[in-house]
């Protein structure tokens, strides 16, 4: 079975992908992790990808598709969940073409739906300890002292990409890119909408009921 998880930043799709791996033994494929792994092992595809990444450019779709094909070829009978890929209709079409050559297909696509104001709260409320890496949220998971880490009393920081104006822009870009993709999978009768409002356990139960 091949699943695709879609959803805006802060919708928790990465967490749900990790739960599918730990609870149901899916192989969880995040394209960011996959790219970093290929670069670190200096594979031929990784070396090509690194040339683009060093220049701050997006890695071309054909390289990403080739990496995914290598993973699937090694174990075509496993269950896979793709997190954050495809990102647009062009990638979805290239992915589908590649899967067809292997007599595989995307079985279901889950879109994690969440209101913008909840996403902004989830992300802009994040605070991180620069010393130990502990993460808090001033709305949902407060430290004992509002501004200090529970572990080592280091002042907490807000990362630049968690600032509200950055999040609003990320959401705008995400919608522009991804809404056509949602329509693409809806047309193919593969789209399932999951309400991402709730605890990660509650959302996972909803997801499992749709598998």
Curated annotation (Swiss-Prot):
GO terms for biological process: AMP salvage. Residues 30-59 are annotated as: NMP. GO terms for molecular function: adenylate kinase activity; ATP binding; zinc ion binding. GO terms for cellular component: cytoplasm. CDD domains: ADK. It catalyses: AMP + ATP = 2 ADP. Pathway: Purine metabolism; AMP biosynthesis via salvage pathway; AMP from ADP: step 1/1. It is an enzyme of class 2 (transferase). Transmembrane segments: none annotated. Monomer. This is Adenylate kinase. It comes from Hydrogenobaculum sp. (strain Y04AAS1).
């Amino acid at each position: 079975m091949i699943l695709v998880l879609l959803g805006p930043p802060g919708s928790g799709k990465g967490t749900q992908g990790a739960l599918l791996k730990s609870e149901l033994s899916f192989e969880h494929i995040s394209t960011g992790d996959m790219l970093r792994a290929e670069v670190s092992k200096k594979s031929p595809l990784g070396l090509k990808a690194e040339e683009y990444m060093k220049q701050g450019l997006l890695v071309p779709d054909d390289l990403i598709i080739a990496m995914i094909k290598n993973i699937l070829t090694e174990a075509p009978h496993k269950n896979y969940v793709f997190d954050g890929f495809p990102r647009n209709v062009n990638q979805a079409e290239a992915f589908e073409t590649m899967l067809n050559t292997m007599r595989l297909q995307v079985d279901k696509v889950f879109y994690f739906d969440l209101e913008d104001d909840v996403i902004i709260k989830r992300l802009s409320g994040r605070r991180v300890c620069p010393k130990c890496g502990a993460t808090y949220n001033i709305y949902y998971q407060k430290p004992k002292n509002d501004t200090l880490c529970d572990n080592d009393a280091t002042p907490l920081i807000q990362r630049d990409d968690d600032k509200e104006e950055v999040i609003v822009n990320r959401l705008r870009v995400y919608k522009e890119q991804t809404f056509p993709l949602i329509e693409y999978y809806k047309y193919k009768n593969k789209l399932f909408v999951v309400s991402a409002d709730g605890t990660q356990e509650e959302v996972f139960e909803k997801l499992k009921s749709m598998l």
